[in-house]
Amino acid sequence: MPGVIMNQDNINGRGLGLHDQLNGVSSAPAGSSQLGNPVGLHNGSLPTNGVQHPDSRGSDENYRTKMMLSASGDPPELQHIVQGFFPLAKLLNRSAQQCWNDLADLVAELAEIQVPSHDSNFSPISPNTKVLGNQSPENVRKKLRALEFAQKKRGEFIKLLVLSQWSRQAADVSRLIDIQNFIRTQHQAYAGALQCMGDMKRDLVRAQVANPDLNTALEVLLRGEVVSMPDLGYRPPKPLTPKSTLKKMRKINRVISTRLALHDDIPLAFQKYRVHDGRVTFVVPGEFELDLSIGEEDVTSQFFFVDIRFLFSPSPSIPAGRMLSELDIKINDTLRNGGLSECFNWLHNLILTNKINILARQASELSRSLWSNVLRSELLHRTLVLQYWASKPNTKSWLEIGIRRGPRESTIGGMRPPSLGLRWIRDGQEVNSDDVEFDTDSLSVDRLLRSAIALHISHILSSAFRRISEKLLYSNGSLSLHAYLTRTEPGDCQLDVQLTASRRLRVAIEPLSGAIVLAATPNTLERVDTDRNMDRSTIDDIVSRVGRLRCAAAIEEVESQVKMLGFISVSPRNVRIDARSLFPANVLRFSFFWHHHWERSWLLAATSSMDGDKWWVVQTPSADSVTINRSLDAAVHHASSAVRSAQVICNLLLPAEQPDYSSLADLGHCLSGFLAIYANARFLQDLQFIKIWPHLEHLRIGPGLQVPDLNIEYEATKLPEALRVALPAGFKRKTFVKKTIRLAFHGIDRCRKVAIMVAYGNLSTSFPALGDLVAEDDHSLVLQKTGTGFALRLLASPGYPVVVALLESLQRLECVLSVYEILRRKKMDARFLSLSRLGFAYGPNKELLAQLDIGETQPQLPTEMDPLKLAFRTGHLFHYRLSISFDHSNPHRRIQGPLASNLNRPTAEAGLDTLTEILSFTLPLMQALDRFMANPSRNESSIVHVTVRNATSFQIHYPYEKCRLRLVAHQHQNQPVWVLRDVLSFQDGSCEPEFKHKLQERLYNSKGTGWRGLGNGVIAEPDHIGDLLDELDRCLASTKANTTPKALDSRTSHDAPAANNQSPAIRPEKSVEAADMHGGFVNRNLQQKAGPASQKTDVITID
């Protein structure tokens, strides 16, 4: 009886009830007993075959009720049906509660789905310019699941709405149910009456007894026999003795053997038989043994069934009794009608059906026990379908066991009989089932399923093995991969994958459910194994998950190791790098690193894929416009919107052996070193003026974490104009360095936090004992003592190119060697040498020391360091300027300024060659001036001013005598000489007459050792210039003896300096005649053309 939903008003009696008025009869009150027994029959008892059955109320009460109803004339009241009714409010409460429970389950299910983080800056935009939001597969699946839940619950509540509207008319439907129940009860009463009458008639037949045969009974009683019964003359057989029994058995055996050998057509399946004990036993392997015998010797007579035994297990036993009798009858009928062939066919089909039923029963037992919810079995006619891994989505797999028929011929000939066949559908496709262990002699569904599942798992793991082994990491033997497969036990099938040098993964498939089981050693992060696509096949899922786990393990291992070396992990979002477009598509995991020692525009990236793990060097645009500290927060905020370059530098993330502290330190050293080398190679390639090898694309970290060296082709003449050093005027560029320069990395200076770069090269000219001139504490330059090799040490942050400094140092080295070569040619001894200065000794005994300094202007950083700007820049970036310095005891210190100026003047006579000649030429003069300084006999009246015009031109001024003399160098008969002449004081008469007369007499018209007068001057050899000055001093002393101090005071009050200045001083004079400032020995014409000087001159005051 279907249930009825009543609204609350009708249930509680607030509306019109069914008992208010039914069939025109007023119903009983709500509290009457009729509601307590709604199903009972109250219209009287039901008579059957004229017999009235009393009910619980008694016949008298029923009779009185009938009489009352008949007296009233109203029909009896219909039974009111309330069984199965329940209120609508209960249904609504249950539905609301169920909706709440389902919603809670949905929330928990959606929480388990991991949605990757979403960056709003990279959200896709629809054609209508609306942001689509996160469109990842996980997020879409969550939305679809929520939509399906809402749609389902909406349908349920629509049904509740329809029921609530229908329940308002439930009273009429309830009345109809009562009428239907009454009609059905009447039909049942009619049917019961007919059935009772039929049963009675059948029972009466058995009760009939035939009339007794009194005559035969009397004859038997009187005579003990019946004469009327015929006598057939049968005699009982004689009892058999053992001998006769044996004889008959042997006779039957001969008859059966003869018959089978000569007359009967024995089917192929019955070819194996034996005759014994008066019977023949046909043996069908794996099925049954059939015992038959004969009833007579006629060869055309049939065989008779004796016994049958099943040869497979488990096999049912045939119980004695009805079943055995029916089997006996059926076999004998088959033997009589069809012979042995038909008997075999019938028994064979019986056995096949029996085997299928046994397998079906085993499958049913398995599905209710160990294989619950994972095995489904269904018997269709004589085909058993076994679906394993039933809870697994996507494609299905099952086994079909049925009777195989077909025109397959046997090995002997003829058609093969039907047999049990196995059909294997693996992942929706039929495959060969020959390897499945299907033993029809020993039936076992469990063993069959295990064999099929083992083969299925072996297929999955072998396919995954084949696909993983095609990856480069496993094909070249970098990582190991082993598969253990079996055909019988699925739990023994497994795939061992080496993830990294220290981590391994075991892949297996749970035999019952088909779920993939991954076990990592040590345990890998579970969060990386969350992306499980249900639409993928199992093989694709295994390969994908193994790839993700391997790459995640590799990157995790690298991150944990390199962070101990001070590396900082950088998020690609902070540097605005689109890693998916930067790296190949097969890269599954990546991580960016930076170090606080490096330049901000360089990053290292570690990528991992199934084809290999690689280190990348990534160059981002310079962040000059952004102020960045070298702190953790600032280090990850690179101002880069794109990647300038990215290149693979190593195919190994960590050392091949088990990493320890030393190998990790080597890794950090190698990465920083390679970055330093690569930055220089990138700079040179962008410069496009200098060849390098190996080429930038072939630059890799060598075996054993060896930092490669960079070979540079160096030619100063082929450098861009900006990088060619501007040498001092008159300095000729000469090549001393061979073309090939090798740039190598030599570690990190931990104090300065810079990379140590060393450039190795060879000199084209061998200089003996040159290496001894470099100081041991000078680390910027090393010269080989026994060869031509040299090394330059450069410092810079890893990632900052040292190319500009290297090229400048090489040109500086050539400049220093050029100076050294000139000094050696001039017979001067070099005492020490560096890239910025060169010390040498000169003089007759090499007792005087001098130092040549090489200075330059510094480039403007950082814009000047851009290789593209340097390549097209006009003008030199570096300008060299030579200077010379002397120690305090060197007499040439007095003309140090003019000598330095003479080194850098753009004239033909200027230069280092001229400087060395000037040093030798002026040395006697400077020594003579030093003697003047050291003369203790000088007094106030013998002050002399010596003004240095240039290195070869001097003015001697005697303030008290108002006399000015000029001492210049001249060429006389191709020999350099000193010429002493008067300057203006003789012509204008300002000079003291007595002093003038003395000069004319003792110098101009006289001669001495190494000097002689010219009438208007004196010429002296360079080595005897001291003798001339001594004679001049004596001339002055003799003049002073004839003059008074007072007159001397009056004469010197206007032009003499203060008398209290007793020490030599250098001060400028403005009204003196300019001397020729050209370096070297000037000729007479050049000396006469010299004009007044526009620069300050030095005055040497000697007292």
From Swiss-Prot:
Enumerate the residue ranges of region (Disordered): 22-61, 1043-1067
Localization, UniProt: Nucleus
Q: Which GO terms describe its biological process?
A: regulation of transcription by RNA polymerase II
A GO molecular-function term, please? transcription coregulator activity
This protein is called Mediator of RNA polymerase II transcription subunit 14
Q: Which GO terms describe its cellular component?
A: core mediator complex; mediator complex
What Pfam family is a match, any one?
Answer: Med14
Asked if the keyword Transcription regulation belongs to this entry, the reply reads yes
Q: Which InterPro entries match?
A: Med14_N, Mediator_Med14
| Compositional bias per record (Polar residues), positions renumbered to this chain | 23-36
Q: Which UniProt keywords apply?
A: Activator, Nucleus, Transcription, Transcription regulation
Sum up the protein's function in the record's words: Component of the Mediator complex, a coactivator involved in the regulated transcription of nearly all RNA polymerase II-dependent genes. Mediator functions as a bridge to convey information from gene-specific regulatory proteins to the basal RNA polymerase II transcription machinery. Mediator is recruited to promoters by direct interactions with regulatory proteins and serves as a scaffold for the assembly of a functional preinitiation complex with RNA polymerase II and the general transcription factors.
Q: How does it assemble?
A: Component of the Mediator complex.
Species for this entry: Emericella nidulans (strain FGSC A4 / ATCC 38163 / CBS 112.46 / NRRL 194 / M139)
**Superkingdom in the source lineage:** Eukaryota
Q: What is its main location?
A: nucleus
- What family does the database annotate? Belongs to the Mediator complex subunit 14 family.
